[in-house]
Amino acid sequence: FSALVAAKTLSFEEALLLVSLRAKFMQEAVPEGEGAIAAIIGLSYKELNTICQSISNEGSLVELANINSSNQIVISGSKEAVDIAILRSTEAGAKRAILLPMSVPAHCKLMKPASERFKVVLNSINMQEPKCSVIQNVDASETNNVAKISENLISQIYSPVRWTDIMNSFNQLTLGKCIECGPGKVLSGLMKKALKDTEIISLDEYESFLDKENLI
């Protein structure tokens, strides 16, 4: 959403409204305590996806929710299924399998009801054509098509965040510099490992914006 504000597709006020309602709808989609999220480190995409599909086929849903790197992936789903996935991931050789302190099982199919409610609100917003291309979580490809952007905003609620693919898109664009804006330096750390020839800068505090305001 911040990227869409920067691209002039959404106003700051529209983005605040959408982010607030999106969070509300996601929180209300699954009763508290029935969903869970966990980080799995040390298994490949294929290995972890096989585990999740096997558990889901047994009746309770768990899916890949955030592909941060080749061996650092977040899973999301019902509490029961995520607990089983943590156990099976550990048995399969994961270095770490940690339940995260989040009650909303984001980026999995349990969020489809939230996406339907969000769609109604989003359709009431008159989004503008972006001043520059944006790359979204769902397909990790460049677009300046408003209809596609809207479609992706809806589907990303229940679809995985393809961060590794996004970094690959950055790499193909041969960017000389990537700047992470926001709290923490997690994405900067991941980009430094993946984008060897790109300068990575993190602006995670107010003072850092003042120090580096002329970098762009």
Can you name each region flagged by the protein language model?
Residues 123-216:
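Acyltransferase/transacylase module recognition
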Residues 5-158:
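Alpha/beta catalytic cores of group-transfer enzymes, especially the acyltransferase/condensing modules
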Residues 2-6, 188:
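Short helix immediately C-terminal to the catalytic nucleophile in hydrolase catalytic domains
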